[in-house]
Regions:
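Histone-fold recognition with a strong bias for associated Lys/Arg-rich disordered tails
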Residues: 1-201
């Protein structure tokens, strides 16, 4: 796989997954390393996707930590960890998903799709246990992207503007943080009047 097909953020995620594999003394870069770096990325797309699904992100990270602690370790070989066969399959699935979505580059959300689609890894099981499946990811992604496609290597920056600078009023209302409308008849009437005005020709 050619890494120049990845967005800048996706390249960074793969690099951090490799760093995490070195840190955990793993002989391979696994799907669990990849998922941990995706979920930990605060300025990425994965956290907003999972938040829209109401997923316990810290719960996922805790499970990943437990899995990574149990993984086999190697010491003193001086060799870089290699990409596991399962992770190679995830990259292939992610690329297929990017093609299906007519995206020109493989971005971080495609990596999340790939993990969810490749059902044999512990990372995929952790996602399933938290109710994260491919169809749910796609629905959440559509809301975040707003119809935009990945046409360059900085695509995530562009379609995250809405997430970063906007506010999801549905979530705010569900959390009970919206001001009540009771007793504000004049304001409501005025808003309806403004919204229902026809444009003069």
């Amino acid at each position: 796989m050619r890494y120049d097909q990845f967005t800048i953020k996706a390249q960074g995620i793969v690099q951090r997954a490799q760093d995490l594999a070195v840190q955990t003394q793993s002989p391979e870069i696994s799907p669990e390393h990849l998922l941990e770096t995706l979920v930990a990325q605060e300025d990425g797309v994965t956290q907003p996707i999972l938040q829209k699904l109401g997923v316990d992100i810290e719960g996922i990270r805790l499970k990943l930590t437990q899995v990574l602690e149990r993984n086999p370790k190697v010491q003193g070989t001086g060799q870089e960890p290699v990409v596991s066969q399962t992770l190679k399959r995830i990259f292939d699935l992610a690329l297929k998903e990017a093609t299906y979505l007519r995206d020109e580059y493989l971005s971080t959300e495609h990596l999340l799709f790939g993990i969810a689609e490749e059902k044999t890894s512990q990372a995929a099981k952790i996602l399933r246990d938290h109710g994260v499946i491919k169809d749910q990811i796609l629905k959440s992604l559509v809301a975040i992207r707003g119809g935009q496609q990945v046409t360059d290597q900085n695509a995530e920056e562009k379609y995250q503007s809405l997430t970063r600078f906007g506010q999801d009023l549905t979530l705010t209302a569900q959390a009970g943080k919206l001001d009540p409308v009771i007793g504000r008849d004049d304001e409501v009437r005025r808003i309806l009047q403004v919204l229902s005005r026809r444009r003069k020709k």
